């Protein structure tokens, strides 16, 4: 296409426009030869003609609001040939009037097959002196296209005053009037082509109800349009120009208000969800327990017995043999065993099938990802997903309804902290691994009633930085939510966020410990993620972490650990221990939750599946799941300078009564051993909690 266009188009003067094409997102190359700013003429393309010396720059918000329309127009310009279809520059009013004229010509004169060239009256002004052929020349539009049916007599003469179009290129040597009339009025075939062109052009345009963008359904309005003849419609449009702008402003304001209402409604639902899951009822019981699915465990057992038993598969033996083959480097045998496991396992089957599915994934990743690329890419894809607190809370609520583990861990920790701070005026809690802060709403609720003399609650939340440009975003959001709860219950609050990858390297001044405050250190189920000693290091990071807590000299130190022994350096031993541990967890869910529960599927995949992948497929510093038994941690803590507070037998008995009241499964185990509060499933201890003070 020629780069230099000059001439007259529809009465518009665009000499004031800039000489570069805006980037509309369709890859249109910039050019200084022509510029069609269609967004400036969207509201009234054939009504307002600016002065020649007027420089117009539309507001940025107006351009943004019509960005979708610009994309449609730009796509049309990219796909159509401007040299072959010159009428693309004409406005909709001229097109509509041309249609009416064609209908009248066809109906009045069937004998007249073409319009003589000499019956067309043209008048041009400034034919040669107003334009130049340079690449920086502007296009001056001085044409007025008017159709008045009363001028169409028997002769069918049409008058186009001042109508030289795009003159200046060699291929546009004839006046635009003659080209237009010959192509449109030559014979009846041209009429059919014209209608066919309309049908083709309509494919590029959106539906009628899509011209109002980003409006909610309740905000849509039906605007009646009355078609008038001649200049009356144009005059009415010009008269109501400001009224339409005011109406559009009202629509935009109403849309903003509706969005604010929607956001407030979502916040209200999210707050209600947090309250239901994290707060206590009038009897100091978790509200989520009442609506949980644990009460249906008996029905699930009966339903399972009623079904016809499927052929039993010994997944444990198959998985163990496959792990031994992987460890020995026997890829052929391992692949054969994996195929047998894949035929029977399923992420939505029973407990053993789900367990086999995730362990088979981990074994396959270890077998195929000898260089670590496949393993780490999978692990990063899971860990780097940005999961909102609401998404985690849904899965967390299912875990609470299925098992009492987290509820009793929080109850134990909160009671020990409240006992230590019963007369405190300022309580400072340092929470290692605060994450979303699910532990603290119920604590704040109870603190507001048990200690009316408390002047301030301070919480220092410590967490591993998340991926991205804002590593502290998650823990800052946690602080904001806790602030809202403190305002709600009337507890003065101060929050401090620390993001650190290696917790043993945090400086003492970062905790902002002040004199005359009760200091409580809390670490719930995060010891398993601490780095262990690796070859080449003299000091163990786990011992360094405990030494840091001892240097803080807390009034009370609460620790809850995952009781597992799959931190061994030997793969086969680690695999067997992990298989025993996660078999109990999957069996727990199978006995208390239905197979089709979507939150159960999400929780098993996002948490247990990721942990299994890390334990089995990763090695070295990439393996971050390294749990130890509670007796191993007891030795470490005593060596670090702590002494253990005894667990009251009355407290364990109270927890047993609570668990029976809440309707949990009878196979859950609560016990006390060596001043540790233990929880498990069917005799296997899974979690342990204890309270420590400096010796």
From Swiss-Prot:
Ranges for region Disordered: 105-136, 234-260
Family of the protein in this entry: Belongs to the GRAS family.
UniProtKB keywords: Coiled coil, Nucleus, Transcription, Transcription regulation
Coiled-coil positions: 233-266
Region feature (Leucine repeat I (LRI)): 313-377
Region (PFYRE): 519-614
Transmembrane segments: none
Protein name, per record: Scarecrow-like protein 31
């Amino acid at each position: 296409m020629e780069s230099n266009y000059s001439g007259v188009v529809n009465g518009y003067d665009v000499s004031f426009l800039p000489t570069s094409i805006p980037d509309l997102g369709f890859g249109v190359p910039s050019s200084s030869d022509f510029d069609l700013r269609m967004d400036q003429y969207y509201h009234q393309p054939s009504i307002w003609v600016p002065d020649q010396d007027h420089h117009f720059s539309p507001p940025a918000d107006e351009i943004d609001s019509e960005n979708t329309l610009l994309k449609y127009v730009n796509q049309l310009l990219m796909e159509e040939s401007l040299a072959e279809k010159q009428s693309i520059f004409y406005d909709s009013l001229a097109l509509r009037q041309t249609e009416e004229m064609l209908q009248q010509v066809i109906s009045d004169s069937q004998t007249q097959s073409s319009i003589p060239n000499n019956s067309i009256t043209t008048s041009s002004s400034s034919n040669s002196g107003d334009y130049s052929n340079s690449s920086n020349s502007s296009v001056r539009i001085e044409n007025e296209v008017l159709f008045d049916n009363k001028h169409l007599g028997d002769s069918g003469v049409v008058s186009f005053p001042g109508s030289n179009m795009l003159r200046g290129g060699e291929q546009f040597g004839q006046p635009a009037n003659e080209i237009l009339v010959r192509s449109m009025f030559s014979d009846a075939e041209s009429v059919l082509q014209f209608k066919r062109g309309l049908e083709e052009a309509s494919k590029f345009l959106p539906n009628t109800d899509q011209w109002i963008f980003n409006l909610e359904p309740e905000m849509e309005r039906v605007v009646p349009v009355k078609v008038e003849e001649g200049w009356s419609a144009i005059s009415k449009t010009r008269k109501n120009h400001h009224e339409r702008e005011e109406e559009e402003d009202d629509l935009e304001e109403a849309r903003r208000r509706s969005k604010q209402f929607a956001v407030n409604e979502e916040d209200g639902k999210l707050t209600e969800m947090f309250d239901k899951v994290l707060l206590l009822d009038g009897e100091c019981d978790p509200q989520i327990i009442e609506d949980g699915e644990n009460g249906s465990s008996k029905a699930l057992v009966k339903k399972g017995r009623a079904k016809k038993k499927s052929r039993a598969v010994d997944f444990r033996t198959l998985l163990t043999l496959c792990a031994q083959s992987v460890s020995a480097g026997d890829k052929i045998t391992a692949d054969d065993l994996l195929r047998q496991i894949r035929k029977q396992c399923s992420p939505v089957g029973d407990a053993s099938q789900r367990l086999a599915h995730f362990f088979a994934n981990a074994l396959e990743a270890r077998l195929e990802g000898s260089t670590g690329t496949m393993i780490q890419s999978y692990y990063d894809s899971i860990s780097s997903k940005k999961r909102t607190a609401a998404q985690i809370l849904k899965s967390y609520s299912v875990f609470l309804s299925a098992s009492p583990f987290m509820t009793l861990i929080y109850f134990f920790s909160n009671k020990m902290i409240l006992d230590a701070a019963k007369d405190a005026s300022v309580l400072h809690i340092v929470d290692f691994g605060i994450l979303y802060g699910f532990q603290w709403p119920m604590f704040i609720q109870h603190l507001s009633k048990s200690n009316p003399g408390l002047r301030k609650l301070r919480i220092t939340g410590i967490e591993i930085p998340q991926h991205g440009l804002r590593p502290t975003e998650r823990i800052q959001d946690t602080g904001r939510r806790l602030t809202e709860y403190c305002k709600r219950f009337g507890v003065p609050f101060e929050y401090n966020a620390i993001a650190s990858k290696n917790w043993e390297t945090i400086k003492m001044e970062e905790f902002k410990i002040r004199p005359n405050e009760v200091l409580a250190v809390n670490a719930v189920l995060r010891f398993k993620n601490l780095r262990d000693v690796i070859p080449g290091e003299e000091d163990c990071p786990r011992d360094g972490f405990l030494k840091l807590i001892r240097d803080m000299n807390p009034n009370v130190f609460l620790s809850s650990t995952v009781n597992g022994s799959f931190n061994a350096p030997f793969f086969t031993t680690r695999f067997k221990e992990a298989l025993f541990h996660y078999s109990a967890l999957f069996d727990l869910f199978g006995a208390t939750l239905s197979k089709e529960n979507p939150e159960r599927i999400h929780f098993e995949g996002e948490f247990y599946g990721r942990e299994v992948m890390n334990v089995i497929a990763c090695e070295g510093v990439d393996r971050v799941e390294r749990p130890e038994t509670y007796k191993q941690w007891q030795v470490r803590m005593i060596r670090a300078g702590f002494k253990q507070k005894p667990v009251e037998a009355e407290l364990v008995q109270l927890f047993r009564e609570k668990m029976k009241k809440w309707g949990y499964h009878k196979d859950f185990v609560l016990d006390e051993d060596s001043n540790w509060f233990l929880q498990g499933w069917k005799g296997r201890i899974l979690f342990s909690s204890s309270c420590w003070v400096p010796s």
